[in-house]
Amino acid sequence: MELQKSPHAPGVRPVKIHCRDVGSGLPVVFLHGGWGYRVYPINRQVKAFGDRVHFLIPDRSGYGRSEKLSGQMPADFHQRAAEETLLLLNAMGIERAIFWGHSDGAVIAAMIGLSAPQRCARLILEAFHFSPRKPNSRSFFKQFAVHPDELKEKTQRLLAADHGEKQWRKVVQRNCRVWLKLGAESTRSSDDLYKGRLSKLKVPVTFIHGRGDPRTEPGEIERARKAMAGADMRFIECGRHSPHSEKACWRECNEILGEFFVGK
């Protein structure tokens, strides 16, 4: 698929977007995290629900088989990615869907909910980020912003398979650096990625969150819950950053997803 242009790929025309299109039935758009799709894939969910769910899994520009990008990511990349996603769905003729976002993808899904609620049957926000400040992750971001080759070999293989041997390091570095930038530009501990707008969300929201997520700051999810008092919050006790793909808890994650994917 080619977009005439995308705010997530400034200066590039046209913009090539690769989208996996699997299954049939209820449209569900899965929005991957900041390192791309194949590190945390939804293979088990496709297998479990593919006979009743039409999964659309786009690679954002800069990722996977979509348009290659260079240079630093802008601080408002989540909003830009939300706009790109809607442009893609317009081109595909998808008017309304469940948006399931993981990590950075969950931020993007929430921003779609704010800007285009009529397009959203539900938001499923997994491994959600609320704060731009991540002091407990700063050393993680600093390490891999400079030394991506220090990642585990398995992770490197998955990244290379997704983005290519020449590109995967750049993907990791761009994402780590923009999170460091977000933290540096935040002036108050009360800052959030949504500029105080989450309470204005008018679509059904379900959080899926691993209790042991290392990218979550103390009190961060509680702040998100307070901002969205009516949201459905599901903690997975054994979960870390990607409950849907973790061996210990993907089944529990599927039970939750099945509430929204079965019989719709």
What are these regions (language model features)?
Residues 15-68:
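Conserved HGGG/HGGXW glycine-rich cap/lid loop of the alpha/beta-hydrolase fold
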Residues 201, 207-209:
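Short beta-strand/loop motif that positions the catalytic acidic residue
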